[in-house]
């Protein structure tokens, strides 16, 4: 529970981690709450930071929220199977992310089609 805050912070993560047997965990994903603005400024102590945007959110999502992309190591452009129906160019989203942060790894994904998952795993260095 984040209380009145719109995001998780390192203190909340630390409290949660104390309740887990970390010897039984090989990989832990933490999904911050809120939108792409609020959690961008808060470092949770992660080894890698991933931002996920969907083509259904429109072509403007990356340029509208540059800070989360600056703070991230990997950008996942999700639901690319819906791009044509939405009139969105996923390559534009990729270019925008790379323009904001040239070192970001960008992966196009369609979970429905099963594409891009291996690339995400590779980007995570797993």
For the regions a protein language model found, what residue spans apply to each?
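Nucleotide-state-sensitive switch-loop elements of NTP-binding domains
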Residues: 1-47, 115
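TRAFAC-class small GTPase G-domain
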Residues: 3, 9, 19-22, 29, ...
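Conserved nucleotide-binding/hydrolysis micro-motifs of P-loop NTPases
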Residues: 34-36, 56-60, 80-83, 112-115
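Inter-motif core of Ras-like GTPase G domains
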Residues: 32, 39-57, 65-77
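Short, well-ordered secondary-structure micro-motifs
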Residues: 8-11, 39-43, 61-65, 87-88, ...
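Canonical P-loop GTPase G-domain recognition
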Residues: 74, 82-126
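Signal for well-folded cores of large energy- and translation-related assemblies
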Residues: 18-21, 37-41, 54, 81, ...
